[in-house]
A protein has these predicted regions:
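Flexible "stalk/tail and boundary" regions
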Residues: 22, 38-40, 61-62, 78-89, ...
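Short loop/turn segments immediately following beta-strands, especially the blade-tip
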Residues: 172-179, 282-287
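Conserved beta-strand positions in repeat-built beta-propeller and related beta-rich domains
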Residues: 11, 26-31, 65-72, 108-120, ...
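A short beta-strand motif characteristic of beta-propeller blades
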Residues: 4-9, 42-49, 83-90, 136-142, ...
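Beta-rich, blade/repeat-based domains predominating
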Residues: 9-23, 50-69, 91-108, 114-115, ...
Length: 290
């Protein structure tokens, strides 16, 4: 039976970076520069405005919100209504910074485009960046093809990142010092389909069975994938799916950020405001974190 999607917020420019934290749903709206919280009835609050475009979100152990500032390639904190620079990522990021996952110790892993998508530059690899609390940023992994959505397993031992332009999910062991090792392919999405309609990973989230829900804008769907690449389920959307997160009281509500926009045309996204937050109920709960 097809699952039924419901729109709980529309009129957005480009929703991204969805997170479920302390029984609330949060996300960034790129081109309005706003970070929102939102409930299941569509009631929302603007948490903060980020002048250089917010993207990935996370929280420190003390509850301080972390926000990736895209265009100036910085990591910011937001606490007591004060937006503060934590780290300058510009030396390690090839172009705009994007998604982020933060572990229970406050270590932040941050992706970036690697090349200027707006100018049509040639695709090239880049770094996945690590920012430890109170330390300078460093390279967690190099030669990553557009590191995007990222999750950490419930035991805190494995990080999995979506490489958008390689159409794969790549896993690493997380060492005691938060560095990464033992790189391997977790799922090759190009090998997961036989019709040539290859999903590409954008935002994603982990469920309690260890499968990952992956938003794929290229195929207008979110897919549930297990290690090895088997696609367990697909939920189609009318436009493009850019990110997803499990939340709700039982952690079985899948929040999906959708938009007609391509992600490389800010003017169109601002003009059309086709972005939505859609929800759908699924069978397996999340784990309360990406």
């Amino acid at each position: 039976m097809a699952r039924k999607l419901k729109t709980i917020m529309d009129g957005l420019t480009f929703g991204e970076g969805p997170r479920w934290y302390q029984n609330k749903f949060y996300f960034s709206d790129f081109y309005s520069h706003k970070v929102y919280s939102l409930d299941l009835n569509g009631n929302y609050e603007v948490i903060v405005e980020v002048p250089n475009q917010p993207s990935g979100l996370g929280w420190m152990p003390d509850g301080t919100m972390l926000i990736v500032s895209m265009k100036d390639r910085k990591l910011l904190s937001f606490k007591d209504n004060l937006l503060k620079e934590i780290a300058d990522l510009s030396e390690l990021a090839g172009f705009h910074c994007n998604d982020m996952v933060v572990d229970v110790h406050g270590n932040a892993y941050i992706g970036n485009f690697g090349f200027n998508t707006y100018a049509g530059e040639e695709v090239k690899s880049t770094n996945l960046i690590l920012v430890r609390p109170d330390e300078e940023p460093c390279v967690a992994a190099d030669d990553v093809m557009f590191p995007n959505g990222t999750v950490i397993t419930g035991d805190g031992k494995t990080l999995i990142v979506g490489e958008t332009y390689a159409a794969r999910l790549t896993a690493f062991d997380i060492n005691d010092d938060a560095s990464l090792s033992n790189r391997r392919v977790w799922a090759d999405l190009a090998e997961s389909v036989d019709d040539g309609n290859v999903p590409v990973p954008d935002g994603m989230c982990l469920d309690a069975e260890g499968a990952i829900w992956v938003a794929s804008p290229s195929t207008a769907e979110v897919i549930r994938v297990r290690e090895g690449g088997q696609i367990l389920e697909s939920i189609s959307v009318e436009t493009n799916a850019y990110a997803c997160m499990l939340g709700g009281d039982d952690l079985k509500t899948l929040f999906i950020c959708t938009s007609n926009a391509s992600g490389v045309d800010p003017d169109s996204a601002l003009r059309e405001k086709s972005g939505k937050i859609e929800i759908v109920e699924v069978d397996v709960p999340g784990i309360g974190r990406p």
